A protein has these predicted regions:
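A mature extracytoplasmic/lumenal domain signature
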Residues: 74, 84-85, 112, 119, ...
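Surface-exposed, charged secondary-structure patches
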Residues: 93-141, 243-290
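A short gly/proline-enriched turn/hairpin at secondary-structure junctions
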Residues: 73-87, 95-101, 221, 225-236, ...
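Short, low-complexity N-terminal intrinsically disordered segments enriched in polar/charged residues
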Residues: 21-76, 158, 166-216, 220-224
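Short beta-strand edge/turn micro-motifs at domain boundaries
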Residues: 141-175, 290-315
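Bacterial N-terminal signal peptides
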Residues: 9-18
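Bacterial N-terminal signal peptides that target proteins for export
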Residues: 1-8
Length: 315
């Protein structure tokens, strides 16, 4: 987690979501090493309490403007997503010296942990805060997602995003000023991972199924355990809850699009996809606006299955 934060007010509802030969003379030693490796038990999964302790230390670093936490505890491939898209680690560190923030207090609650394989942990929690950054008041309550990955024997943050908690029916027609500041982070192209095309295809299929209110198709495209934070900061903890929301009659959409996508592998069987999502239609009587979506996929056999997502209105 890092607190380069983009404070946004919800707009309109949108779905979201080679081998080398070994010299013969080395075979015995290598076989012995392989046997030792095979016999070594897998490292235990992290506890929610341990990762939340690390997460809270990141919030304290944000409060104290201590960029060293990011340097030490954020993966080099990590990033945040806000209303303008991705912000990389270097920009996060820079913001701690260029952005003026006064954080009087904060608290984290309702924390949950979901594993996306043995080396990827997804934390979700509510965040209450009394803060002003560059003259802009932070929203009092947001629902946050923070993802950690195992790097060697250490767990490091790799992703953070938040959605302001608002009443969908009371949300304005367009977003208010962004939390995070007048600082304009340069939009840098993200080199696509080799798996980007496959993930984009999976994401597009999911959006089409949402458009068509196709419960069966959504069930096929998603993993057994899923959770989701929508554009209004509402958290859906189970697959049943998410499916009920996605297939409800609240949205009337004719066309959907998934563009500006980039993928990053988090582990051999887990990947994160960020993209700009759009829909031609309305949700809850309001025109659907563009969103920045983040989706986590896990590999099941030959297929990528959606397991977690968070959406933010695009600025």
């Amino acid at each position: 987690m890092t607190k380069i934060k983009y404070f946004v007010l919800a707009a309109a509802a949108a779905f979201v979501f080679t081998a080398c030969g070994t010299p013969a003379g080395n075979a015995p030693a290598n076989n012995a090493n392989a046997a030792n490796t095979a016999a070594k038990p897998a490292a235990a999964a992290p506890t929610k309490e341990a990762l939340m302790t690390l997460e809270k230390s990141g919030w304290e670093a944000w409060k104290n403007r201590d960029a060293k936490w990011i340097e030490d505890n954020y993966s080099d491939k990590g990033f945040n997503v806000g209303s303008t898209g991705r912000t990389d680690k270097a920009a996060m560190i820079k913001s701690y010296t260029t952005q003026k923030c006064e954080i009087k207090s904060y608290s984290l609650s309702d924390d949950q942990m979901q594993m996306a394989g043995p080396d990827v942990a997804i934390l979700t929690f509510k965040s209450a805060q009394d803060a002003v950054c560059d003259g802009k008041k932070a929203p009092a309550n947001v629902h946050s997602a923070s993802i950690y990955i195992r790097e060697g024997d250490k767990w490091k943050a790799v992703f953070y995003a938040e959605a302001e908690i608002v009443d969908p029916k009371a949300a304005p027609a367009k977003p208010a000023d962004k939390k995070g500041s007048p600082i304009k982070f340069e939009a840098k192209p993200v080199a696509p991972d080799a798996g980007t095309d496959a993930l984009v295809s999976a994401e597009k299929a999911l959006w089409e199924a949402w458009k068509d209110h196709d419960t069966k198709k959504i069930e096929e495209l998603t993993a057994r355990d899923i959770s989701f934070i929508n554009i209004f900061g509402t958290y859906f903890a189970t697959k049943a809850d998410a499916l009920k929301d996605w297939t409800s009659p609240g949205c009337d959409v004719k066309n959907v699009s998934v563009t500006d996508a980039a993928a990053t592998m988090l582990s051999p069987t887990a990947a994160i996809l960020t993209f700009n999502g759009g829909a031609d239609g309305t949700c809850f009587g309001q025109k659907v606006g563009p969103i920045w979506g983040t989706s986590i996929y896990i590999k099941e056999g030959d297929a990528w299955k959606w397991t977690f997502g968070i959406n933010l209105p695009a600025g």
